UniProtKB/Swiss-Prot annotation:
Keywords: ATP-binding, Cytoplasm, Kinase, Nucleotide-binding, Pyrimidine biosynthesis, Transferase. The gene is pyrH. This is Uridylate kinase. ATP binds at residues 26-29, 68, 72, 181, 184. It is found in: Cytoplasm. Signal peptide: none annotated. Catalyzes the reversible phosphorylation of UMP to UDP. It is an enzyme of class 2 (transferase). GO terms for cellular component: cytoplasm. GO terms for biological process: 'de novo' CTP biosynthetic process; UDP biosynthetic process. NCBIfam families: pyrH_bact (TIGR02075). It catalyses: UMP + ATP = UDP + ADP. Pathway: Pyrimidine metabolism; CTP biosynthesis via de novo pathway; UDP from UMP (UMPK route): step 1/1. Homohexamer.
Length: 266
């Protein structure tokens, strides 16, 4: 279903409670650089404030960050570099973004851990899902870096896989636009935004907000996705409060199912 207009989202309704207990937030690396190479401190600070506000409400949060503001393996390989090697360069870029976000969160008093799929003990813990869950249960934000630690897999796929393994209830896919459109709204003024999409419709239409592997993984395991505009302050809170912003990708009628957040056996 499409509504044709983005519109500005209102502030979260006063007195409401979050509808999700544990979420995974996917951030594109390009957003960290504000369209440029490197990290824009103002943007990262804004993201950190939004995350801190949600964590203060008791929501358990994990984050996956891309590295497109530094390197993009698939693009480097087109220029003649070995694909696997260029993907590893991209993974290192994601870790730089993780450390930047960690720094801004810690400055706000939010206890944070970075876990990476490639061992780098001086700056991060190794990725251990049970440990990540324990951190979140203690109110810490866990930031996952270095993708899946293997070439040929995107950070979108990483987000889907990590969300499933840590028992998240939803993937919050943050973008620079307010949802999924039938064409690029930056070049087509008549582009129509979808309120809800089924996984199979996303794949059939070849909509490019995430790669097919990530969408298939979410579809096969019933993991809902909310695609929303991160650049509007407060939208992360609106998403976890269940407000209808952006585009919901799920099966059924557009209401994300409440997946059960899980904890490891004690």
């Amino acid at each position: 279903m499409a509504d044709g207009e983005g519109g500005a989202a209102s502030a979260p309704t006063a007195g409401t409670r979050p509808v999700y207990r544990r979420v995974l937030l996917k951030l594109g690396g390009e957003m960290f650089g504000g369209g440029h190479v490197g990290v824009d401190p103002d943007i990262v600070a804004s993201i950190a404030r939004q995350i801190a506000a949600v964590v203060a409400e008791g929501v358990q949060m994990a984050v996956v960050i891309g590295g497109g503001n530094f390197f993009r393996g698939a693009e480097l390989s087109v220029r003649g570099m070995d694909r696997a090697r260029s993907d590893y360069m991209g993974m290192l870029g994601t870790v730089m973004n993780c450390l930047a976000l960690q720094d801004f969160l810690e400055k706000l008093g939010v206890d944070t851990r970075v876990q990476t799929a490639i061992t780098m003990g001086q700056v991060a813990e190794p990725y251990i899902p049970r440990r990540a869950i324990r951190h979140m249960e203690k109110g810490r934000v866990v930031i996952f870096g270095a993708g899946l630690g293997a070439p040929y897999f995107s950070t979108d796929t990483t987000a889907a896989q990590r969300a499933l393994e840590i028992g998240a209830e939803v993937v919050l896919m943050a973008k620079a636009v307010d949802g999924v459109y039938d064409s690029d709204p930056k070049t087509n003024a008549d582009a129509v935004r979808f309120d809800h999409l089924d996984y199979d419709e996303v794949l059939a239409r070849d909509l490019k907000f995430a790669d097919a592997t990530a969408i298939s993984l979410c579809r096969d395991n019933g993991m809902p996705i909310i695609v929303f505009n991160l650049l509007e302050e407060g939208n992360i809170a609106r998403a976890v409060h269940g407000e209808k912003i952006g585009t919901i990708v799920s099966s059924g009628d557009g209401v994300p199912p409440r997946r059960q957040a899980v904890s490891p056996a004690r």
